[in-house]
Amino acid sequence: MKLVTIVIAAATTLIPIEAWADCDAQTGKQVYNKCVACHALEPGVHLMGPSLHGLFGRTAGDLEGFVYSGAMTNASFIWDQQTFGLFMEDPMQYLPGTTMPFAGIRKPEQREALGCYLAGLDDID
């Protein structure tokens, strides 16, 4: 099972930049202002929520150094464009039991822009 997770994670690390090639990262940076109080962008810097650095291609609830809710720890998905969009639309509906105190981002274009911004940061490293 671990090998399958590793293969899927490796395959999805290429998805964000290609999938968001024509997206609006500048708007995403503005949308990130809703996240900045709880999530840092620097690797290993955890606030109320985990660092968002390197999010895409990572297994949910598996970032070293952060204590996740049971729901997130037991989640079995890899962060990609689709899971990010669904989660950010309504975190508590997508993952019941999550402790992320955020109602979600209703506008699809804002979710896409935020994902684009975060994926672009991963590409800079």
Spans of features found by a protein language model:
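Sec-dependent signal peptide recognition
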Residues: 1-9
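Sec-exported extracytoplasmic/periplasmic mature domains
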Residues: 33-43, 57, 89-93, 119-123
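Solvent-exposed helix-loop boundary motif
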Residues: 49-70, 89
